Amino acid sequence: MERVIFENSQVRVVEFKNKYFVDEIMDGEVISSSIGMEFEDLNDYLKDAGYSIVL
């Protein structure tokens, strides 16, 4: 079962089977922008993508 661990008007971070995914929200559509990654890599991914989010 998936669990949303963070969501705002630009991005949603989802956990699924101990992997994390980042979905970008554009014009009301969710665009899958990451493949399952470890939690340790999540903050680096968000920073590199230009988001000021720290989990």
Where do the PLM segments sit?
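Acidic, low-complexity, intrinsically disordered interaction modules
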Residues: 4-55
